Design a protein with these regions (language model features):
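Hydrophobic positions on the alpha1 helix immediately C-terminal to the Walker A/P-loop
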Residues: 35
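Short hydrophobic/aromatic beta-strand immediately N-terminal to the Walker A/P-loop
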Residues: 23-25
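Post-Walker A helix-loop "phosphate-sensing" segment adjacent to the P-loop in P-loop NTPases
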Residues: 41-50
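The conserved Walker
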Residues: 28
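Conserved lysine of the Walker
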Residues: 32
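ATP-dependent NMP and nucleoside kinases share a basic, alpha-helical "lid"
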Residues: 109-158
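Conserved nucleotide-sensing/catalytic segment adjacent to the nucleotide-binding pocket
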Residues: 52, 58, 62-107, 119
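NTP-dependent small-molecule kinase module
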Residues: 1-13, 154-158, 176-207
C-alpha cells in the first residue's frame, strides 16, 4: 500500500466515525510529522484538531541521566523526558468536548484547540509512551540510521538552525537510546511503517 492509499483509507475511516482519535509517533526524523500534516490537510479542518506533542518534552530533562549510560544526556527516546500526565489530561479534555490551550514554544505560538471538533490527531514521540486505550488507532514510523541522519542534517540545519557538527556528534547517542528505550514502543502500533531510504513500507497492517 502506498502513502496516498493509506491516507485515503484513514480519511474514510475517520469520516465514517470508525476512528476519532489517531496517534502518530516514531523516533526523530522518521517522517511522522510530514505524514500527520498530509493527513490533516486531507480532512475537513473544521472537524479535526492536530495536537503536536513536542511542547510536552520537558526542558528540565538535563537534570537526569540514563542509568545505563550516565555520560549521556536524556533524549526524547526516554519516557522521563515527556510530560505524559499533562498530555494525557489534554487529550482526555479534548475527547470530552473541552477546549485546550496549547503550550507556547519559541518555534510555535500557543493556540486554542476546540473541543467541539470530533476528530483528534495526536502526533509526536510522546504518543509511544501513552496508554494505547487513548487511541482508536496508532501509526508508528521508523527509518534506518543512515536515513535518520540525512534527514536530521537536512532539517535541523535549515529549519532549526542547528549545527551540523553537533548533529553528527550526537547521532550515535540518539540511535543507541532509540534502540534501547524507544524501539519497543513500535510493537504497540496498529500500523508500523518503515521509511528507510525514503521508501514507504507497511510492516504491520491492522486496518
Amino acid at each position: 500500500m502506498k502513502k496516498k492509499e493509506l491516507i485515503e483509507r484513514l480519511v474514510s475511516e475517520i469520516e465514517s466515525g470508525k476512528v476519532k482519535t489517531l496517534g502518530i509517533y516514531g523516533h526523530g526524523a522518521s517522517g511522522k510529522s510530514t505524514f500527520a500534516q498530509e493527513l490533516y490537510q486531507a480532512l475537513d479542518y473544521t472537524t479535526v484538531n492536530l495536537l503536536e506533542t513536542d511542547p510536552y518534552i520537558t526542558s528540565e530533562r538535563h537534570l537526569v541521566v540514563p542509568k545505563q549510560a550516565p555520560d549521556q544526556k536524556v533524549t526524547a527516546c526516554l519516557s522521563v523526558a515527556h510530560e505524559l500526565a499533562s498530555l494525557q489530561r489534554d487529550i482526555l479534555a479534548l475527547q470530552a468536548g473541552m477546549d485546550v490551550l496549547t503550550i507556547e514554544e519559541p518555534w510555535k505560538a500557543s493556540e486554542i484547540l476546540s473541543g467541539s471538533k470530533p476528530i483528534l490527531i495526536v502526533e509526536g514521540m510522546s504518543v509511544g509512551f501513552l496508554p494505547k486505550e487513548l487511541f482508536d488507532k496508532t501509526i508508528c514510523f521508523y527509518t534506518n540510521e543512515e536515513t535518520e541522519l540525512k534527514r536530521r542534517l537536512a532539517r535541523d540545519t535549515t529549519v532549526r538552525n542547528g549545527d551540523a557538527s553537533f548533529i553528527l556528534a550526537s547521532q550515535q547517542m540518539r540511535r543507541e537510546q532509540y534502540l534501547q528505550y524507544y524501539k519497543e514502543t513500535e510493537s504497540k502500533a496498529d500500523i508500523l511503517i518503515n521509511q528507510s531510504n525514503n521508501k514507504f513500507q507497511i510492516k504491520t497492517n491492522i486496518i
